[in-house]
């Protein structure tokens, strides 16, 4: 399932685990279940901090959960998290294993303070392994579930669970459903969503907290509305002049985030939207904006 190069990389990453974790697989007699069993067994061979059980009783089969040893699994993959989702699997292993996520400290505190929503605290994300936007959503909900025991999340490979896709009338991926385990049928959202957007939607007091943060800031000489390339460029220009500068935006990067291939950015032969936005954001953070 995993080639020698990936196994070696996995062994290196799993050295970052701070406490033992357990992979619990729920299997059936299908060929895909044998693939899932092989995957979890190979992961278990990469670290003495990873144990494997094959006696899970989760409804969706084949699937497997990642749990801190002695706890119930709150991060689960229904299907094979390969392709674009392999990074989601790797981060899920690390975060459940106690390695801190690369998230702003105030966002982590906000996640830890979330209360279980009235609509249920179990989320299911239907994905496609070829989807470019799906990993961000899967990783966001996995991070929330790893940090806050009130929440749990299952990634569902729509290609492997076609009857579920048809039953829930999934028309696009990623689509996120909310509810309780075994009954997550209410649509929470679809398409690209950032961790911050998801947390804000789950946090009933998010608007008041954001307003308080804004009120605590000083006055701005220049306040730029929009966080796309033009907004980032204008903000850097203003900040370099020594004036107090801020950016107001729903999501940094704007439409560029949803653009996969970019070949008309002068001096750069080819890049991708998320990669360009990450570079823009890092550049903006070099200044007091």
Regions inferred by a protein language model and the residue ranges of each:
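Conserved hydrophobic helix-helix packing surfaces used for dimerization/oligomerization
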Residues: 23, 123, 222-224, 245
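Beta1/beta-strand and adjacent pyrophosphate-binding region of the FAD-binding site
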Residues: 213-230
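N-terminal Rossmann-like dinucleotide/flavin-binding domain of flavoprotein oxidoreductases
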Residues: 36-39, 257-289
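Gly/Ala-rich phosphate-binding loop of Rossmann-like dinucleotide-binding domains
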Residues: 145, 235, 239
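Glycine-rich FAD pyrophosphate-binding loop
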Residues: 240-258
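Thioredoxin-like thiol-disulfide oxidoreductase module
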Residues: 40-69, 150, 154-183, 193-205
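Non-catalytic, surface beta->alpha helical segment in thiol-disulfide oxidoreductase systems
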Residues: 68-100, 178-210
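Local sequence-structure signature of Cys/Sec-based thiol-disulfide redox active-site neighborhoods
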Residues: 3-41, 113-149, 154
